[in-house]
Each structure stands twice: as structure tokens, then as C-alpha cells.
């Protein structure tokens, strides 16, 4: 297929399925916590606006959660079908970590999801709120275990190699490896930020069409407060994550910077734009700021950033991809900070809900969080190459033995099936968003209907005959 061998087709297939999958957990994590906040506000204030927003977003959450589960299962199977070399080599670590995720997070989510989605008038309000909080907690726990596994692949420790296989010797070191805290914070905050932008864009769409209800205004306001607070925090977390990467994966940082060689005694410049050329080993058309690279990455003007030529050619990641994926992520992050700042200014001026240029800006920024997450993961995963377990196992040694034709057919099948199934799912979510929150109705009088209320009501109805 397109002149690619089975190895590269397997990489493309996994990148395709992962890219589809990551979108759903990112929104699920943020929406679950958002729903917990909405229900908490409803219980505290009895303001029907919060109840209306809860019912509106819980439907979208349910669709998104279902698609995330399906896409995640397919991705997990690929460890055995396409990457059996990796599973055989490192399965004693990645297998238990994924099992812990199922036992602690997925069971928690599955156990309380039904109560959360269908128990509003069937269980008491306290129990229902508890169920919503447990689902939100489950998404965070799931993030914990998944990122522990991925971070171990980036900065492996706590293991020995015995008879050509990884054997864990210190599970605390395996889980809390050097990059894990930064990656967990960075991804979790990215999920909250992406969800805020998603919610804000949905509200902006309704405001642009004159749907200026209290519920729409409330979710727009909440989303922009979240963006204002979280976007700058995310930038600071990203800076800390970058310093950690500089320490443990210097070749990745060199590729991100498009930096090929140092001049003795001079600080490293910051390349704003350019085109890293892997064949000529230089960055063409570079626009740079002297010394700023050293200042940002080492917080000093006396230190230099590692250069790509300091690493063997076979150990360098593809700088062209990593250079631009990082800049896409960082550029979108700056726009998010700008969005939050403009919202604060317009809020002060009393024009937050009436400025049509700003509403259009908020609408167009809706997918920016998800795009930034995808760009960030491209930076992370392509920047790790040519290793699947950094410095321990090469990606070429991890792939299963498949023919080029078989991989081509399976890749095309994935593209068609994913495009069809998840296209329908996305379309349905957009239909739900277009409907908007329903006007708040006064709560029903009396006690909530219990699980056996249907049978009881039926028996009473028969007696009335």
C-alpha cells in the first residue's frame, strides 16, 4: 500500500486507532467532572438551570463514553495482533498495569454508570450524586493507569531483563517513573481544558442563533472561567514537562527544537519556524531568536540544549514531524490563553454574550483542545522513536510478522469501519448539541421513583380496575 512495508503500515494503523480513541477519553474525563459539578450545584441551590444542563450533557457524555469503550477495546487487541514482539518483551509490566485499570477504573465506571444515566428519578438524590462522582473518579483512575504504562515506555525503570524479557523488580518505580507525574498532570489538565472549549463552543453556537437562555449563558460562562484559569496553568505544566523531557529524552527535545549543532561557548537559539531536513541535517528557512532556546529550556544563558548531531543517525526521531506538531500544540495553547483573557475583558465590559466576533472565535476554538491533544501525542510518540520502550526495545523489534497485503487490507478496513461507525456517533452528538438544553421544568413532587416502582404502580392500577 503506497509502497509501505508491513512495519510502517502497522505503525500507521496503530496511530490511526489511537488518534480516534484519545478524542473520546479526553472529553469523557472533562465531562464527567463537569456533570459532578452541575449536580452538586443543583443539590445545593435547587436552581433548575443546573438540572437542565446536567440532563443535556449527560446524554452527550453517554454517547461519547460508549464510543470510547469500543475504540479502546480495538486498540488493546492490537498489542497482540500487530505488536506481539512488544507484548512478549514487556507484557509482564504493561499487562498488569492495564489489568489494574480494568479492575479499579472500568469496574467503577461500569458499576455506577447505569445509576448515573438512568437513576435520576429512581434513586435518592444523594445516591445519584454519589454515582456521578464515582464515574468521574473512575475516569481519573483510568487516566492514572494508562499514563503510568505509557510513561514507563518513555522513561522505563524498576525492571530487569531476564532471558530477553522485562521482569519487574520494583512496582513503585515502574508506576512512578520519572515522566509519569508530569504526563499525568499534562494530560488530565488537557482533558479538562478540551472539555471546557467543547462546552463553550456549543454555547457559542446557540448564542449566535439567539438562543440566549439562562442555561446556555451559564455553560458559556463556566467554560470561559475554566479556560481563563486552566490554560495558563497548562502552559506552566508543559514547561515543567519539557524540562523533565530534556533530562530523560534529550534527543526528543533536540528534534522539537529543530536544533542540529551547538556553537562552542554560545547559548542555544530558539527556532520559531523552519523546516528540519533529516537528509541534509539542518533546518532550512529557520527564523530564530538568539539565546532564547537556552533560556526557555535550561532557564539559564550559560547552558546549551543537546543537538541532534550529538546522537547517532539511527537514534534520532523524525524532527520534521515533531518540530511542527509541537508548534501546533503550543500555538493552540496560546490561542486558548487569549480566549480566556478576551472573555475576562468582555465580561468586565458586559458584552460577553453579545460580542458576535468573540462568539465566533469561541465557536472556532471548540475543537482546538482535541487538536492540541493529538498534536501533543504525536510529539510524544514520534519523538520517542526509534524506540517503543525508550533505550530498551526498538520499535522495529516489537512488530508482529505480517505480510504487506494483510496489513494494507486491515488498515483500509479500519479506515472504512471507523469512518462509518464513529461518523454516525459524531453526527448524533452534534444533533444533541443543536437541540440545546431544554427549558428547566419544576421538579416532580413526591419521592423519587424506586427501582420497583413500575411493578408497584402496575399492581395498584390493576386493583383500581
Which stretches of residues belong to each language-model region?
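Polytopic transmembrane helical bundles with strong interfacial aromatic enrichment
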Residues: 1-465
